Design a protein with these regions (language model features):
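Active-site beta->alpha loop and helix N-cap motifs at the rims of alpha/beta catalytic domains
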Residues: 2-9, 13-144
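Catalytic alpha/beta core domains of metabolic enzymes, predominantly
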Residues: 126-127, 140-183
Length: 183
């Protein structure tokens, strides 16, 4: 089983009108994706509403997904938030649940330098023993991780993949040309 090939679905987190998670529907969505052949489930990313959930709810959603998937396909769990210390705490808590990897977004709202991004991601990567997928989504975070930053981070043993939601083919090609198959 690998998280690095095929189709990984960023799954939605369904809610009831009162704001509570609809776990029955969530379970049905997971089963549908597995039955239709998806290769991995990404839980509590942007599509999964992670930025709107308190930590305990996010952890519960991830825990439910891991148990529902039951090892049939990889589960990549969103654990990045807008500050480093919080991201580390959340990543460590989620690591205990047993996901196959963590999806860590660039900090949102707080714009930092590329060196600040390096320090942020390295601190998180140093705090866990799980593969980390870098998530570059400037439309949601307000900042772009530069190709050179991604290259630098690709040298870390725990940083193994990159999710590109930049929406600029020139940037994507620059990352590919610079980083190659390192992630």
């Amino acid at each position: 089983m690998t998280i690095y090939t095929g189709s990984g679905v960023a799954i939605v987190t369904p809610f009831f009108e009162d704001g509570s998670v609809d776990y029955n529907t969530f379970g049905e969505l997971i089963e549908f994706q597995i039955a239709e052949g998806t290769d991995a489930i990404i839980v509590a990313g942007t599509t999964g509403e992670s930025s709107t959930m308190p930590d305990d709810e996010q952890v519960a959603v991830i825990d439910f997904a891991i148990k529902k998937v039951a090892g049939r396909i990889p589960v990549i769990a969103g654990s990045g938030v807008n500050d480093t210390a919080h991201s580390i705490r959340l990543s460590k808590e989620i690591e205990k649940l047993g996901p196959d990897a963590l999806l860590v977004v660039t900090p949102y709202y707080i714009k930092t330098s590329q060196q600040g991004l390096i320090e942020h991601f390295e601190a998180i990567a140093n705090s866990v023993d799980l593969p980390i997928v870098l998530y570059n989504v400037p439309g949601r975070t307000g900042q772009v991780m530069a190709p050179e930053t991604i290259l630098h981070l690709s040298q870390h043993k725990n940083i193994v993949a990159y999710k590109d939601a930049v929406g600029d083919i020139a940037h994507t090609l620059a990352v590919r040309n610079l980083v190659g198959d390192k992630i």
